[in-house]
Structures are given as C-alpha cells and as structure tokens.
C-alpha cells in the first residue's frame, strides 16, 4: 500500500510504501476491548470512610414504646446510623477493595493497535467518526513537521492540508457536560479532532497543545485509546514520515 508524502506547505513531494500494519484486518471488537481496558486501568479505588454515618451514640429504645426499634439519638427521638435514617450509613457502598482494573492479552492489545492504525487509512471509517477532511488518506508529512514549534505555523499547515475544518468542528462542538461532572472538574465535553504522530517531539507537541481537540503523541507511546477515542476507530491522523519507521519496528 502506497501513500503520498506532503510537505508543510501541503504540496505532494513523493510517495512512500506504507508498513504492512496498514493492511491489518479491521477488528472493532478488539479495539473496543483494548480501549476499555486502558480506561479501567486508570481508575482509582474509592469508597466512603469506614465509620461514615456511624459516628453517633444512638441506641435502640427496644420494644414497648410504640415506635420502631431503630437506633435513636440520646437527646431526642430522631433515628440515626441506619441506612434509612438521615445522615445514616450508606447501604452496600462502593468498597476500595474492589478490583477495578481489567486485563487484556498482550497479543490482543497489539493487534488492536495495529487494527486501529489501519483504520486511519480508510476514508469511510474516518468519515463515520464525523471528521472533516479533503484529500487522500493516510496523511503522511515529511519529517520537518516535527520541528514546528509555533501554533500559527501548525495552523497554516493544517489549512494547506485541508484539515483545519476538523479543528473548527471540535472547537464549535465544545458543550457543557450533562450531569454532576460539571462540578467535578469536567465541566465541558470536548470533541476529539486530529491526532499528530511523530517520531520525536522537536517542538510539535508545544505547537499542537493549544488547538481544540488536537492530540500529539510519539510513535513509541501510541495506544488504542488515542487512535479510537470512545472506542470508535478511524481518528483523523497525521503521520510524520520518520514515525512510520518507528511504528514498523515497534509493532
């Protein structure tokens, strides 16, 4: 499988034979499994304080008082400690001892990454994620892109390559999150846009970090979650020419 190489002005400058990884079978089931495992392994154990709701001297009055036999505070009739009482303990709360991580076979994980990489070269799968682009896929750029250190320079490249519309899609798609996540540091939901993969960070990481929805990663740290956000493969990806060599050696 061949692909065109473009420079940072968006002009074609040659062709490259892509690694065999781009011919991998599309396996959405494995990709989903790998992404969910990665997300699960980031979770922290959580649970209430061991004595939450039980820090009280409440005792039951016992039978013979014409009221239920729930524990009651010493200075009154109000129930305490039990789950149905105000301020009482939770019934069946989450426990820190629960194992939240998930295991995945190493061969499955690698095959999922290979499959997600191959999906970035299929226009129908990329378009199904909602990405906006013009031109052929995959997008391979000469190694000079790795030395771009200014966001304005990266913006000019994305406009020349016909990818800027996707960045604007991500910018305009930023919405206030539904639910309590709003007050837990996750107020906005940000759509994912372009993924830039390079062999080394010679400045491109700094240039890309302030563009909405754009992510940067070196080829040696590429994973299934970056290639398939939300378990959906086909992320619009820009590959630097040297990164393909690293990818071929790694996978």
Curated annotation (Swiss-Prot):
PROSITE patterns given in the database record: RIBOSOMAL_L1E
Q: Which domain of life is it from?
A: Archaea
Q: Which InterPro entries match?
A: Ribosomal_uL4, Ribosomal_uL4_dom_sf, Ribosomal_uL4_euk/arc_CS, Ribosomal_uL4_euk/arch, Ribosomall_uL4-arc
Q: A single GO molecular function, which one?
A: structural constituent of ribosome
Which positions are tagged coiled coil?
none
Single GO biological process annotation from the record: translation
GO cellular component terms given for this protein: ribonucleoprotein complex; ribosome
One Pfam family per UniProt: Ribosomal_L4
Could you tell me the keywords of this UniProt record? Answer: Ribonucleoprotein, Ribosomal protein, RNA-binding, rRNA-binding
Which NCBIfam families does the record cross-reference, listed alphabetically?
A: rpl4p_arch (TIGR03672)
Assigned protein family: Belongs to the universal ribosomal protein uL4 family.
Protein purpose:
One of the primary rRNA binding proteins, this protein initially binds near the 5'-end of the 23S rRNA. It is important during the early stages of 50S assembly. It makes multiple contacts with different domains of the 23S rRNA in the assembled 50S subunit and ribosome. Forms part of the polypeptide exit tunnel.
Could you give the subunit structure recorded for this chain? Part of the 50S ribosomal subunit.
- What is the name attached to this protein's record? Large ribosomal subunit protein uL4
The source organism is: Methanothrix thermoacetophila (strain DSM 6194 / JCM 14653 / NBRC 101360 / PT)
């Amino acid at each position: 499988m061949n692909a065109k190489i473009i420079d940072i002005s968006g002009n074609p400058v040659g062709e490259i034979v892509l690694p065999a990884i781009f011919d991998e079978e599309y396996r959405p089931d494995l990709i989903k499994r790998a992404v969910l495992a990665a997300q699960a392994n980031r979770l922290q154990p959580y649970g209430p304080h061991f004595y939450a709701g039980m820090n009280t001297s409440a005792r039951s009055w016992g039978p013979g008082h014409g009221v239920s036999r729930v524990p009651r505070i010493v200075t009154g009739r109000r129930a305490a400690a039990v789950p149905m009482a105000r301020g009482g303990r939770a019934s069946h709360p989450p426990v820190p001892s629960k194992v939240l991580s998930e295991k995945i076979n190493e061969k499955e994980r690698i095959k999922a990454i290979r499959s997600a990489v191959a999906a970035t070269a299929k226009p129908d799968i990329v378009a199904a994620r909602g990405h906006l682009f013009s031109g052929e896929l995959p997008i391979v750029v000469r190694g000079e892109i790795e030395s771009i250190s200014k966001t304005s320079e990266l913006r000019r490249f994305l406009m020349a390559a016909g990818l800027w519309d996707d960045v604007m899609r991500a910018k305009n798609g930023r919405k206030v999150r539904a639910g309590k996540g709003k007050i837990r540091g996750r107020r906005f939901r940000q759509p994912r846009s372009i993924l830039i993969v390079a062999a080394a960070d010679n400045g491109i990481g700094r240039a890309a970090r302030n563009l909405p929805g754009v992510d940067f990663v070196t080829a040696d740290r590429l994973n299934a979650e970056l290639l398939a956000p939300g378990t959906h493969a086909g992320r619009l990806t820009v590959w630097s020419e040297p990164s393909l060599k690293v990818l071929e050696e790694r996978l």
